[in-house]
């Protein structure tokens, strides 16, 4: 990923755009084919150092790039950058970089999805307590948590694919988008050679709503990774201790406390998500430019677009690493579930009473009285319910307190995950 966003790669993409434009001019009979052939044979991407040296004088990076190459081409150099404006080269070159970087991110999402899916299947039946508002709710399985992550990553993959398609455009329409010095056919031919579509209506630049959508999509994928990492952090707390990220031999968790085993990588992912999210705001700020363009977006984009790709690429790699090596403590999950004194059975008792004809609020208050007592006195909720003659006289409590009731549809949910993995039928993620 760093290579895609290097200065060397940027200049190589700019040259690729220039050469595609020259090929198109030759095909249209505007620039001699012999001159284009000579330019192709001689032109090489200039070094970033050479461009910087020239830019110190001309104060324009694209002009410095053009001068660095044209100055080495001899008489044919007059055709280099023919009919183009800087943004023709910069925006179209950026589209090439984005497509390459996007494919790397899609690969990273695929690896993360694979890791999550494998661990989800492994822990399909690993029982744990579900928590809402941070408080014990009802039983679920650890595999179901991960299955949800797999589908969220799939939605991220689909969004990124769409955003990349939205960025698969180039423009060679000149200073204000009117083709005054170029030709729509030039743009069509050159973009086709580059694997891009012409921007339907451009100004001096490609409209920045495309870039904002891309950055927002990267931020949304980062937010998903943050959500997953935050869950791992919560499960790693001493009071919970249901999961832990990998901890290597010789690793130290603290400079002062030898006992510490902190979820530092998960914390790092949460921090980087904030950076990617903030960058999306910059992308939105860049949409509104003066008239046919100003250059206020340029300095910001040179930071936020590469940084967002680099950060998310790292986040996906480290998240997959965490999941692949995640220590899952099934016995601790069971103990934490049992520590709730069976309070999670409250809805089962409530509905069973309603089924007997008892008015819902009366049933709710009756069950709640036992739940509060179990909580305050640390007594077993099922025992208190069984001791209530009114409840015991109305319903058969054995099936009500069947733990397997909560996981009876797990196989059905995992069939959806299997379908997603097979890609044999459409699944709405």
Which residues fall in each region the model found?
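A helix-coil-helix interface module used to build multimeric assemblies
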Residues: 1-173, 179, 184-189, 198, ...
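Residue-level signal for inorganic ion chemistry
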Residues: 29, 269, 312, 363
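Conserved hydrophobic residue
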Residues: 31, 36, 240-241, 359
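Glycine-rich cofactor-pocket loops
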Residues: 121-143, 243-254, 259-260, 291-300, ...
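Active-site-adjacent "gating/activation" loops or surface patches in catalytic cores
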Residues: 187-204, 208
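A conserved active-site cap/scaffold subdomain adjacent to cofactor or substrate pockets
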Residues: 207-310
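Long, amphipathic alpha-helical stalk/connector segments used for oligomerization, subunit docking
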Residues: 275-358, 366
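C-terminal hydrophobic structural anchor segments
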Residues: 342-393
């Amino acid at each position: 990923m760093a290579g895609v966003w290097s200065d060397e790669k940027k200049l190589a993409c700019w040259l690729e755009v220039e050469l595609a434009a020259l090929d198109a001019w030759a095909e249209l009979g505007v620039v001699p084919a012999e001159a284009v052939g000579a330019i192709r044979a001689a032109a090489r991407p200039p070094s970033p150092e050479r461009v910087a040296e020239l830019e110190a004088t001309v104060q324009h990076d694209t002009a410095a790039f053009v001068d660095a190459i044209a100055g080495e081409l001899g008489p044919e150099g007059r055709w280099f950058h023919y009919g183009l404006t800087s943004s023709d080269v910069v925006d179209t070159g950026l589209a090439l970089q984005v497509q390459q970087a996007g494919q790397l991110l899609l690969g990273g999402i695929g690896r993360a999805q694979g890791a999550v899916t494998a661990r989800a299947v492994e822990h399909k039946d690993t029982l744990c307590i579900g928590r809402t508002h941070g408080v014990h709710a009802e039983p679920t399985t650890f595999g179901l948590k991960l299955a949800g992550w797999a589908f969220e990553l799939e939605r991220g993959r689909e969004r990124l694919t769409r955003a990349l398609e939205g960025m698969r455009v180039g423009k060679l329409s000149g200073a204000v988008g009117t083709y005054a010095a170029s030709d729509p056919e030039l743009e069509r031919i050159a973009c086709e050679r580059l694997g891009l579509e012409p921007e339907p209506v451009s100004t001096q630049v490609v409209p920045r709503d495309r870039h904002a959508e891309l950055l927002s999509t990267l931020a949304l994928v980062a937010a998903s990774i943050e959500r997953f990492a935050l869950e791992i952090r919560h499960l790693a707390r001493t009071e919970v201790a249901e999961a832990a990220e990998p901890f290597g031999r010789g690793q130290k968790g603290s400079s002062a406390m030898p006992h510490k085993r902190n979820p530092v990588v998960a914390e790092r992912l949460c921090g980087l998500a904030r950076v990617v999210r903030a960058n999306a705001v910059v992308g939105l700020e860049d949409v509104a430019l003066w008239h046919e363009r100003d250059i206020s977006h340029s300095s910001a984009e040179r930071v936020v677009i590469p940084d967002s790709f680099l950060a998310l690429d790292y986040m996906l790699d480290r998240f997959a690493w965490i999941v692949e090596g995640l220590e899952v403590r099934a016995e601790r999950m069971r103990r934490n579930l049992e520590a709730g004194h069976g309070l999670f059975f409250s809805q089962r008792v409530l509905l069973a009473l309603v089924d007997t004809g008892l008015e819902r609020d009366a049933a709710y208050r009756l069950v709640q009285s036992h739940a509060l007592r179990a909580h305050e006195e640390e007594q077993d909720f099922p025992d208190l319910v069984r001791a209530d003659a009114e409840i015991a006289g109305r319903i058969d409590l054995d099936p009500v307190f069947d733990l397997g009731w909560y996981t009876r549809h797990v196989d059905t949910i995992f069939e959806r995950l299997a379908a997603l993995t097979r890609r044999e039928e459409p699944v709405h993620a």
